Curated annotation (Swiss-Prot):
Organism: Botryotinia fuckeliana (strain B05.10)
PROSITE patterns named among the record's database cross-references: DEAD_ATP_HELICASE, HELICASE_ATP_BIND_1, HELICASE_CTER, Q_MOTIF
Gene name of this polypeptide: ded1
Native organism taxonomy: Eukaryota, Fungi, Dikarya, Ascomycota, Pezizomycotina
EC annotation from Swiss-Prot or TrEMBL: 3.6.4.13
GO annotation, biological process: cytoplasmic translational initiation; negative regulation of cytoplasmic translational initiation in response to stress; positive regulation of formation of translation preinitiation complex; regulatory ncRNA-mediated gene silencing; spliceosomal complex disassembly
Residue ranges of the region described as Disordered: 1-137, 582-683
Name of this protein: ATP-dependent RNA helicase ded1
Family: Belongs to the DEAD box helicase family. DDX3/DED1 subfamily.
Entry keywords, A to Z: ATP-binding, Cytoplasm, Helicase, Hydrolase, Initiation factor, Nucleotide-binding, Protein biosynthesis, RNA-binding
Amino acid sequence: MADQLNMNGLNLNGGEPRSYIPPHMRGKMGGPAPAGPPANLNGSAWAPQGNGYANGPRPAGGDSWANAPDFTPRGNGAPRGGNNWNPSGPPSFNKNAYGNPAAGAGGPGGAGGAGGAGGGAGQARGGGDGQWRDGKHIAGPANARVERELFGIADDPTKQQTGINFEKYDDIPVEASGQDVPEPVLKFTNPPLDDHLIKNIELAHYKVPTPVQKYSIPIVMGGRDLMACAQTGSGKTGGFLFPILSQAFQTGPSPVPANAAGSFGRTRKAYPTSLILAPTRELVSQIYDESRKFAYRSWVRPCVVYGGADIGSQLRQMERGCDLLVATPGRLVDLIERGRISLQNIKYLVLDEADRMLDMGFEPQIRRIVEGEDMPGVQNRQTLMFSATFPRDIQMLARDFLKDYVFLSVGRVGSTSENITQKVEYVEDIDKRSVLLDILHTHGAGLTLIFVETKRMADSLSDFLINQNFPATSIHGDRTQRERERALEMFRNGRCPILVATAVAARGLDIPNVKHVVNYDLPTDIDDYVHRIGRTGRAGNTGISTAFFNRGNRGVCRDLIELLKEANQEIPSFLENIAREGGGFGGGRGGRSGGRGRGGGANRDFRKFGGGGGGGFNGGGGFGGPPASGGYGGGGGGFGGPPAPSSYGPPPGQYGGGGGGYGGGNGGGYGNPSAGGGGQSWW
């Protein structure tokens, strides 16, 4: 039994205790001791069995390593610079590398400090960012990878270049009204633009300013407020980004307010100097991408915040610096309530697609942001409004937000571009799918954007097209932000060349190289039609628009005819016949309700033309006149009321309001027949 259990020296009968030997080590314990460290191993770290020290002498002076002599490395003797491993000696401290600590809370450049959220303009932030140092703008190093990401390569099909038809824009009429309007610029030059911005503009392959840019650049650089109307796709984004960034490069960051510092001189609150508000997530993302492009290698740090995305990542982005903020109104109000954004430093406020923001019900949030928070007053900031249309109610809103502004109208505002070939076809609802298939087979090449009215129809139509072997995707409000971004990206790069969309994608989105827009369902508002077809024919390029029309769309029939006439397009005979059939409904867009009144000066400066506008059954009406006459609803109109020649006190209509409106200055109620100028009002 003992022999069986001996197992290489494990003797159960021996009196001397033996340690347990694991099975995988048995038979290996009787060999010679290791001779030292392997050839490629550090000998000083090799400690075989023994007294616990390495293969060297025991340290002199006792058992403690504290008494051992200083270690001397092999080779070149003692290191230079003393007993340390820095061969070049201790580094000298460069205070300019970290900004001026006294300039504001958090340090660098007075713009937020290292880790602060105010901008951190005094330090290089990495990724090719520049600095603001000693009152000068120092551009960061070039980064080839970032340049390819932002600007693409020459002739990149995913980056739309300026089209050849911008040369025709010199013939488009431009109206600039206001006091002392500056002369337009004809080239991207210094002055007025900063040299660094001009380099980024060249990287983006922009050759000449668009008409709206020719006028907006000197107006904004001159310190004036601006209300600008221009054809969609005419470069409105550059119209406000170019002057804002150019002045930022020249003047540097604003110091964070003295009361902003938290514990240890840091603040997690962002203090942007420029705020750009836009109605949709896609539009703010697009503006943010453009701002990154033109702020490349500069001290300006753009940020974007919008709903439907992870707020944590947006907060972390702001903490790395936030000088130019692009936001949707809802998410901005949320971040203000959380105490993460302050508007104290705002120098520039931009409202892009302002009419769309009011249509979507954002007016309370906009008024709170502009008037109810800590934003500087109208006299202490520059305010810019940009849109393709400016109905009268928006112009009245501008009266509260803008000061001594210049009204800029480029081309036929509220109309479409002649670069777009518009076709209107009579198609009953039951036949729309088959006609759409014929169109897609005929115009197969290029990107096609199809607009529908409902979210359900967007999904249904995209599924139908996929079943017909057409690569299609859809975008609408019920899809998550990630799904919407993925659908747009697949459409942009051509993997899904057919995109079915609701109005969420219609306004302001710059999708390059869209060749064909199909209005599968016509909108009820002609402005929406303008913005939909404006997704093609952008940046001076050409495009095709096809609209499916039937008697269910007769509410926009007259406005559609007027639009086609303005753009020198062919007018189908069935449109004129249907327009004659519906003869009794007068006035502006929207039929019975009158809407905004296309003849009421949606493209004119209301300060020059006063009230008026279409409304109701042959009504005159309008949205009031100059500030002294009150607000909305002045004028004659109403059901059967006589047309009002202007808003300067016309006789009240049968049901119309006599004056004022919304508690306006000279009395009168919004449609209150008993208030002919007295103090009564329903408001």
